[in-house]
């Protein structure tokens, strides 16, 4: 996936199109992310004991990763990302793989 937990993203399709938010949770197997405060849905929940009352609860629903675009921390624009290998090596001796912004060519995570 091109985004990780904690990244700031722009929603590019759907009812929240054009809004920005921070990724709260990433689900790589499902290719979905949960963005804080966006894609709010209402769930009708049954009471589950004295600690969890029932009722209509608003919660954030997952969004497919293809519907979000990473906002580059360097240039501040929503842009596509790519992967490249650095000269440095990780703890296993392999080249370190990092994400970079295709608009400004800056490394996103080090």
Curated annotation (Swiss-Prot):
GO process terms (BP): translation
Xref: SMART domains: KOW (SM00739)
Keyword rRNA-binding: yes
One GO MF term: rRNA binding
Record flagged with keyword Ribonucleoprotein: yes
InterPro entries documented for this protein: KOW, Rib_uL2_dom2, Ribosomal_uL24, Ribosomal_uL24_CS, Ribosomal_uL24_KOW, Translation_prot_SH3-like_sf
Keywords recorded for this protein, A-Z: Ribonucleoprotein, Ribosomal protein, RNA-binding, rRNA-binding
GO cellular component: ribonucleoprotein complex; ribosome
Function: One of two assembly initiator proteins, it binds directly to the 5'-end of the 23S rRNA, where it nucleates assembly of the 50S subunit. One of the proteins that surrounds the polypeptide exit tunnel on the outside of the subunit.
Family: Belongs to the universal ribosomal protein uL24 family.
Subunit structure as annotated in this protein's UniProt entry: Part of the 50S ribosomal subunit.
NCBIfam families the record matches: rplX_bact (TIGR01079)
Protein known as: Large ribosomal subunit protein uL24
Name of the gene encoding the protein in the UniProt record: rplX
């Amino acid at each position: 996936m091109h985004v990780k937990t904690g990244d700031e993203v722009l929603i590019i399709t759907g009812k929240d199109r054009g809004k920005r938010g921070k990724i709260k949770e990433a689900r790589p197997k499902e290719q979905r992310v949960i963005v804080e405060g966006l894609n709010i849905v209402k769930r009708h929940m049954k009471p589950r004991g004295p600690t969890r009352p029932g009722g209509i609860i608003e919660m954030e629903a997952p969004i497919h990763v293809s519907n979000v675009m990473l906002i580059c921390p360097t240039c501040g624009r929503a842009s596509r990302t790519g992967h490249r290998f650095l000269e440095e090596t990780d703890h296993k001796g392999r080249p370190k793989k990092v994400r970079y912004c295709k608009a400004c060519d800056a490394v996103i995570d080090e």
